[in-house]
């Protein structure tokens, strides 16, 4: 019982440690050029082939790229780049549709990163579009 309580306390403490991204960090961010549509399609399709059981026939809708920051864990240093958000509905092996899932693809100067929106307990601690920050 003590172990469970300590684990819960530790998890809550880490969540409370979410440090906000500062205006200074945003102003000093080095962004790559906006990705071309061909680069976006290549990255999304490569991810789908590795992540889905039947990557041949997914339905996908992707929003245009926007400047953003993201981090997998709320206390990590944010990565700045261009974010593309895609809603993907894969086909089941039986032929039926699976549930729609949202994935985020971040194009940075240090490579590309993929995030599953469902994995964030509070998405505002993990992702933010720069045009929404005042």
Where in the sequence are the language-model features?
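Sec-dependent bacterial lipoprotein signal peptides
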Residues: 1-18
């Amino acid at each position: 019982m003590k172990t469970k309580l300590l684990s819960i306390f530790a998890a809550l403490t880490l969540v409370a440690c979410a440090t906000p991204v500062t205006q200074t960090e945003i102003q000093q961010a080095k962004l790559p050029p906006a990705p071309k549509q061909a680069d976006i399609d290549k990255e999304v399709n490569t991810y789908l082939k590795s992540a889905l059981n039947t990557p041949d026939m997914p339905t996908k809708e992707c929003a245009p790229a926007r400047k953003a920051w993201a981090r997998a864990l709320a206390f990590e240093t944010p990565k700045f780049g261009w974010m593309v958000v895609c809603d993907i509905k894969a086909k089941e092996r039986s032929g039926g549709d699976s549930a729609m899932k949202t994935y985020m693809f971040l194009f940075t100067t240090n490579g590309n990163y993929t995030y599953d929106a469902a994995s964030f307990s509070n998405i505002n601690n993990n992702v933010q579009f720069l045009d929404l920050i005042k």
